[in-house]
Amino acid sequence: MMKYFISLSLIALIGLNSCSEPTYPSEYSNQVVVQGYLMANQPIDSIIVRRTARLEEYVSEANLAINGAIVIITSNEINGIVDTLKAMPGNPGFYTSTRNPQNIIKPKQTYTLFVRTPDGRTVTATTTVPDTFHIIAKETFPRVIYYRKGPVVDQTKPYIIDWTSSSMHSDYITSVTSLDSLADQIPRDFGNNNEEKPNRTSYGFNYIDKTHTEIPWFTFHYYGKHMLAILAIDNNYYNFIRQANSGGTDIREIKYDVIGGLGVFGSAAMDSLIVTLQPN
């Protein structure tokens, strides 16, 4: 799940200097960009290390990747983990844990990311993982739902998902992942249906500050089987997406919870359920 976790953040970062006010090639600042997320009760996923892009250059994973970096994740507990990540073959700029057995991320634990690039630049960041929670009455939630229709007992009302509270400070977002690669795309209300197909995973950036929400229909792009997830996100990721989504000239005022570079090193706890979406 984490490899899909809101990857648009890196898109915003690598193109940072192309936003807002006019920018000239001479103003380019080569900075290290990191992106990584830890998921409670899951093994360490990949950390991405790249550089910022010049305004005039072709942007790709390969030419922005920083290879040969030292990437380490540590925990602050006594006898905690020290995991040196290794480069992922065929994925420039991606680093992953090769430990066996795997290190499992603990809820309510604090972790630090350390990155040193081949040219000696150092980037660090720290995240405290939200506590776990669970969706209430998951077993009785309908396994088949109809697009933009409510429960059978009253189809004019929305489906509501309730969950227990993450005991630490957390805001929540929703994610919807299509699990059926052959499922039909939901016709768009606006635009051209011949446009590029949407991603299989989409997110509702509604910063839910309570423990219930309506089913977010706008995040469904396909019919068929889906994983509907609730994520409790840490302060780092909340701060980043709250600022990045503001748009306009505010993009230059983003404050990163990263020392020595740009990016986001965040964490989350998640619970999910599986539903099949049928046409209305």
Task: Label the predicted regions.
Residues C19-N280:
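A sequence/structural signal for flexible, mid-protein segments enriched
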